Amino acid sequence: NLTRVLIGEQVKHPDDDLSEADVLIEANVDDLDPRLWPGVLTSLIRAGAADAWLVPIIMKKGRPAHTVSVLARPDQAADLRYLLVTLTSTIGVRETSVRKTALPRGWVDLIIAGSCISIKIAHRHGTIWQVTPEFDDLERAAAEQDLSPITMLEQAMAAALAAGLVTGAPVPDGLRSST
């Protein structure tokens, strides 16, 4: 018999400060009325899921179905598992521990065509990596201004560019936090 012991220190990856432990909860569902899925996903998000999505699949015997996936913090997993079983026709779920890495983000509000639109800014080390107008704000503003969402998106991106909110630029002061 042999016992081997390794002594050392865990090496920290440079991006460990961006990672967090999460849980991925999934179920394959082949018999739910598809008109119910938008409400299921909305309910999961409102209940605290970090994200929820559907992927179409083909199950055994060629049956069309969906895999519903829910990303959540471990302390929310039990409630979200219960909600998934309650809102769908599934009789079981899978759960896997995962690590999620995400860039820090914040928001800046811009007034575009008389409407306030939040611009999401992903950043790292003081530099902007991505700029994205919040779509709910775009839809609301488009309706207020009687414009198409694509026109409002183009105006929002032009306003962000004019404000210097572009990839590679310094992160602006006064960025609203995601918390």
Feature annotation, model-predicted:
Residues N1-P14:
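Mobile "lid/hinge" segments at catalytic clefts and subdomain interfaces of large enzymes
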Residues Q10-K12, D22-L24, D30-T179:
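Long, contiguous binding/interaction regions
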